[in-house]
Amino acid sequence: MSLEGIGFGYRERAPYASNPAFSRGRLVPEPESPTRTPFQRDRDRIIHSTAFRRLKHKTQVFIAHEGDHYRTRLTHTIEVAQIARALARALRLDEDLAEAVALVHDFGHTPFGHTGEDALNERMKNFGGFDHNAQSLRIVTKLEHRYADFDGLNLSWETLEGLVKHNGPLLGPYAAHPDIPVPQPILDFNARYDLELSRFASLEAQCAAIADDIAYNAHDIDDGLRAGLLTLESLDEVPLAKRLLDIVRTRYPNLDPVRTGHELVRRQITIMVEDVIEEAQRRLASARPGTMEDVHNQPRALVGFSDAMRAEEKVLKRFLFKNLYFHESVVVRRHAADRIVQDLFDACFTDPSLMPDEWRLGCEALDKAALARRVADYLAGMTDNYAVREHRRLFDRTPDLA
């Protein structure tokens, strides 16, 4: 397979790409825009939403913005969107749809990253649980209040199915995680608007999913080096990183550690992107899909790492879990964040009047499950800083996350 010619000039859309001219439309019908495709409108609505702005103050790994240069959900999302567009361009897909799915994929994340999600899921275990992907769907179909004619953003079918299924089907023989029940909010919405949960999502959504992996694999290394939790020497334990570092050290023997780290990160992104493009080309040549429907009916994803790169990526992930995500200083802050989220849930569930007017109005008429879901919606929308301030206001004993 060849990378020749990619990125230089116009290349005709592939027949298996998502075509905005044949979009399945929106849950609430709207007149089409004369100047933008449906997927471009989706991207624009996502960017202008409140949920998108909140990503600025939600963390990836490092809690409470321990430095101005660490990544937040917003910077991560922008990086994922850039990689997703690059992959879509290389494979002659619809770049706007790939970008839209990438931009919306993290909307449902709680404050304090996966720590906040785990804490909220624990409190919601008797009320249907909490899942950030399902929460993303709730935000774009219900919780955003911007438009006169509908709740949410009324995104196109293609963007919604990409959001819900970008990591693979949720039901059926090809379900990515058959042992995990589908979150109830997804099932509830799917009963109104069938997202075909047993079939694979578009190639554009698959680009967004693998772009997420590429981005955080590389950029968590960057942040870990910046924080001093990782060293270039420790990264020599990872075969992929060592191979790239050897190239950098040979070419630039006197390069300072900061630039060496950046050279590693950029080369890792490049090698992973090129691997995905070449592997996708191989899978497409083998499957020979002629239409978008053929993509949906495949027995596996057509965009992904090669077996060799997937094996190397697993080694890298194990290294990051051991040396970064479970580093003592990170774990201490995660325990504090866990306590903040659970304290806030308990307080607001017991006394809904503690929530702002827009959230507490009508709570007296809700049963326990509905009240728990409203409290979860409120907490999930918090930024890290707002959660800390609210905890301090209510308890005056907030753990120090700085």
UniProtKB/Swiss-Prot annotation:
It holds the Pfam family HD_assoc. The keyword Disulfide bond does not apply. One of its GO terms (molecular function) is dGTPase activity. The keyword Chloroplast does not apply. Residues 73-217 form the HD domain. SMART domains: HDc (SM00471). It comes from the Bacteria. GO terms for biological process: dGTP catabolic process. Residues 20-39 are annotated as: Disordered. Transmembrane segments: none annotated. SUPFAM superfamilies: HD-domain/PDEase-like. Keywords: Hydrolase. HAMAP family: dGTPase_type2. Belongs to the dGTPase family. Type 2 subfamily. This is Deoxyguanosinetriphosphate triphosphohydrolase-like protein. It comes from Brucella canis (strain ATCC 23365 / NCTC 10854 / RM-666).
